[in-house]
């Protein structure tokens, strides 16, 4: 179903039916940031709910686990690990935002929560619901070939999809506009004047994304991964976002001793500073891995923004899915084409999903929503289809490419990893 079509309401009615049959439910969400909102929504209608995710302390996990084992719980809500909850008599398993790659654990023990869910649904002879506005190519193919049953919700509850604009930043640079296009700048001002709220997505955390020497071309890279380190101003550290290698920022080039290094690129930390500086009415809050490390941080940011203590929410992809704020009328996407540069055959699919999902945060109430997507490659099919909310068109285009290049779902890929000490 499209974003805002009422999938959560459908989930709750299905759970209600299951509970009346004296059975139980597991509900998976892709991000810890989504659990507080979903649990709060569920608590308006149900009791005996357990919450499981990696943000809980060991003691809290143990307490929830014991409640489930002792038959004190009817509904388990959580991130991917919640699929292992020792719940008996399961009547339904629901995976929200089923397309999300976070359901797959890439480190030991390796598992895909969707595969485990399929196994548990078969074991308990219960339905498995895979919900998404942008299903994975593999899931949609299974639905098209009758392996899964396809149920579609094609309209928003308020029949009010946001108006989406694409902005070519190559043209904006020629006009002297850099970080924000004139359109996005004007729309932010308009929103703040109306006392409405704004979400800005920049899928890169940190302050500067590259520290380089203009004299000799040296770039400060991770010694393990050989990719540029990202500067984090708050801690004054250079961090690798792949292996978490950390070091303090250098003041001189190790190659030529030049002490005038260039800080290039922008992450969410720098964007928050910039937005607060150029918009006098802006009260900006940031949601990314760096601001949500502490206990209950997701919930606090969510509640503060919902209570309108802030009018601009800046974040990475964790703000793209599932969040529902009635006063948000504008979503701005900076570097909307950045994920197309990732060397992965799914980069087009991931780009489409991210843009479609974050666009769905705008105009979810009676207020009209707008979306501005900025990028240097906005004529790419995945961006155009996302701006038109055209999943089927994207799917057909993507399948042509996958078939020609022998990619899934037509062929299986095998990863062989070799390592030694």
Label for each model-derived stretch:
Residues 1-417:
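Inter-lobe coupling/hinge segments of SF2-like helicase ATPases
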Residues 419-421:
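Short, intrinsically disordered, charge-balanced linker/junction segments flanking boundaries
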């Amino acid at each position: 179903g499209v974003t805002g079509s009422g999938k959560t309401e459908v989930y709750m009615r299905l759970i209600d039916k299951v509970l009346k049959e004296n059975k139980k439910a597991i509900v998976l969400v892709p991000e810890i940031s989504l659990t507080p909102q979903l649990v709060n929504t569920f608590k308006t209608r149900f009791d005996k709910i357990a919450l499981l995710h990696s943000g809980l302390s060991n003691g809290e996990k143990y307490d929830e686990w014991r409640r489930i084992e002792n038959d004190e719980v009817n509904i388990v809500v959580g991130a991917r690990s919640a699929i292992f909850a020792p719940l008996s008599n399961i009547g339904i398993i629901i995976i929200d935002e089923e397309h999300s790659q976070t359901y797959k654990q890439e480190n030991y023990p390796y598992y895909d929560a969707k595969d485990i869910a399929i196994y548990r649904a078969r074991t308990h002879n219960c339905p498995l619901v895979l919900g998404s506005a942008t299903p994975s190519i593999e899931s949609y193919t299974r639905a098209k070939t009758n392996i899964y049953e396809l149920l579609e919700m094609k309209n928003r509850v308020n029949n009010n999809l946001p108006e989406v604009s694409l902005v070519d930043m190559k043209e904006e640079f020629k006009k002297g506009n850099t970080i924000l296009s004139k359109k996005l700048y004007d729309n932010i001002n308009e929103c703040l004047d109306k006392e409405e709220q704004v979400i800005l997505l920049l899928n890169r955390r940190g302050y500067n994304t590259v520290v380089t020497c203009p004299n000799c071309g040296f770039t400060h890279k991770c010694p393990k991964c050989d990719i540029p380190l990202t500067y984090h101003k708050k801690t004054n550290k250079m961090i690798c976002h792949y292996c978490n290698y950390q070091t303090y920022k250098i003041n001189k080039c190790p190659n030529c001793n030049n002490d005038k290094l260039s800080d290039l690129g922008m992450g969410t930390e720098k964007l928050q500073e910039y937005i607060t500086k150029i918009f006098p009415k802006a009260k900006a809050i940031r949601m990314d891995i760096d601001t949500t490390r502490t206990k209950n941080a997701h919930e606090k940011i969510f509640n503060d923004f919902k209570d309108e203590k802030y009018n601009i929410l800046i974040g990475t992809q964790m703000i793209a899915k599932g969040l529902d704020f009635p006063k948000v009328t504008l979503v701005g996407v900076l570097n909307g084409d950045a994920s197309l540069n990732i060397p992965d055959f799914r980069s087009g699919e991931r780009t489409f999903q991210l843009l479609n999902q974050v666009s769905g945060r705008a105009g979810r109430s009676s207020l009209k929503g707008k979306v501005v997507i900025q990028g240097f490659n906005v004529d790419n099919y995945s961006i155009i289809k996302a701006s038109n909310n055209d999943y089927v068109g994207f799917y057909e285009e993507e399948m042509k490419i996958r078939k020609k290049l022998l990619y899934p779902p037509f062929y299986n890929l095998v990863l062989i990893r070799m390592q030694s000490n």
